[in-house]
Amino acid sequence: MSSDAPTGPSAPARPHGAIGMVRTASRRVVSVEPFFMEFIAGAEEVLAVHDLSVLLAVVADEDAERRTYARWAESRLVDAVMVVNVREDDDRPAFLADHGIPSVMVGRWDGEPSLPSVRADDVAAMVEAAGYLLELGHRTIAHVTGPGAYLHTQARVRALAAACAPYGIEPVTVEGDYSDDAGERITRELLARSPRPTAIVYDNDVMAVAGLHVAHELGVAVPGEVSLLGWDDSRLCRLTQPPLSTMSLDVHEMGRLVGAAVLETIEGRPAVQDSVVTARLIVRGSTGAPAGT
């Protein structure tokens, strides 16, 4: 893991077989979140065959992310960049193009420049999650999201609201940051509300596991008094008691698809412009019908 690239006269004169990826997050969040480690493993499974590896930088904010890209361009350290957590009005693709670095988007991308993208179908996944909870009888539903600037967060929020609207329900939405701290804090706040949610959807498994711990601490029965639904289906889901229901996304395969798109891009071959990975509902022990139904 790196936060800086070498510069100056000792920098390599040409790319050295690295594919860059920058995470704008605290190192604590990165250290506990399984998603990107599984994603990188999938990408490297494809890239390693071609003597390429992933160079990961963890930075504090968007300005630091741009400075990292600029250093990588100056030192010719990377062949291409995988752009993650696509944002509204995202200027990173244009910035990378201006610096001569090819890129592949991990998330929906309809902007300029036109680039290959690999994304999860967040709308279909949330519609399935919401439909399952509504069919069980839940009518007070909360959603603990990732950062609100991310397009996939916005897509999930809109999809949940649209699914609940025919029932006259307005879900409670609280923004988190994918960390266990956020999962604990927000779950504590939600379980103190009146009326209390009977179901909580989390945008990743780390926050869901943290929420389950809070429910146990407060003596709130899962799923008897509150149902908890995670997202991604990391190994964490099967290690809890009860095991977590979740929206299962094949993150490893998503990484493989991105790795393939990167190879096509740097080799000058046409890349698939929009590859889609679909999550599916996995029901385990943390969800059930609300009490009294």
Residue ranges and their predicted role:
Residues 2-68:
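Amphipathic helical "hinge" segments at domain boundaries
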